[in-house]
Each structure stands twice: as structure tokens, then as C-alpha cells.
Amino acid sequence: MRWEVEDNKYVIDEVWENYGSKHKSFGGWYISGEISRATKGAIGAFHTMGKQCKDVSGGLPTFISPWIDGKKAIMGTSKKVNDNAVTVDQHEKEWNEIFDGIHDVVDACAFQDGHIDYDELDAFFTVNKKLADRYGMQCWTNAESFDRDMPINFLPIKFDKLRMKLEAAKRAGYDKAITFEFSHFMSPQSAYLQAGHLYDRYKEYFGMK
């Protein structure tokens, strides 16, 4: 990940100079590198980028959004299921090591929720929250609003599936929910007709007008 760190040094400085230093609405940083396991060099890379973000901005919060190497982590392959999916225990071991190395410069972790099966949500989410609490980090969920279970990549997710994921995050005591990706898969202005309906169901569920 050395090249990613080197490239982002310039990006971080440019973003702060052009936007962060000029606009009060700039509230923090998303460190956009995505990993799922204890990738070689990842701890050092995230620590370096997180520290630079905080140094230039006077300590504004930072977050990352990794994915879980679960059954549905098959992008870039011809497989239907990842037969080398990480176990809950191994996930806990590897992310304990990662959090231990980055928690002083990364404030929150928003694990993507779409690569594991629905019957695994509680087990993985409980571990994620436990680890975040251990290291004084916030635990968010990145609720994917597209469906990985369809033969077409990708369509807006059925609301019942999105609800299951959000309710699992609530049971685990997560601090916040974000989504990927609203504009394509949940916005009433999306080219997908289903996206507007998903937004309507979301508003109904939460009593929003």
C-alpha cells in the first residue's frame, strides 16, 4: 500500500487547502482505502494517512469503511460463493490487530455489511462493536443499498433485506448508519424505478414524511 500512501499525501494536503481550511461544513475525513483482512502494510498505511489528516486539520475525526471477507466477497472472480470466507474468530483476531495499530488516528470504522449472509449479521456485528469499544472507536455500519443476491450487478436492494441489516446493527449497539450508495440505489431521482420505492419504504419504516 506504499503507493497509495504516497499519492494520498498530496490529496490530503490539497483537500485541506482548497476545502477544509475554508469551509466550516468540512467536518472530518474518510480514508478511502478498502481492506478486509490483515493486508501487509495496511496498519502502517492507515496510520500514516490518519495522522496526516489529523495533523493538517487540527484533529478532525477520521473514519474507514472496510469490507468483511465473507461468503459474498466474490468480486473479480467467477465464483458464486467465496469458499475461503473468513470465520468470525479469524475476523476478530485480525481486526483486533488492525484496531490496535490505528485507533489513535482513526476515530470510527464503518464495516460494509453486504459481503456476509443474513444469518451471520449478529455474530460479525457483535464482534465489530466489541472491538471498537475496546479501542475507544465508534462502530458504524455501511448499509449497502444494492443487492448482491441477484444475477444482475447491481439492483436496489429489497427493503426487507435492508431492514434486517439495520436492525442487526441496532441490536449490536452500533453508533451510526451510513449507506452505499444512495444516489444510484435509493434516491427518488435515480434511473432505477426501484430506488424511489426503496426510499419510500425507508421513510415509512422510520416515520419520516
Where are the language model's segments positioned?
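Glycan-processing catalytic domains of CAZymes
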Residues: 1-209
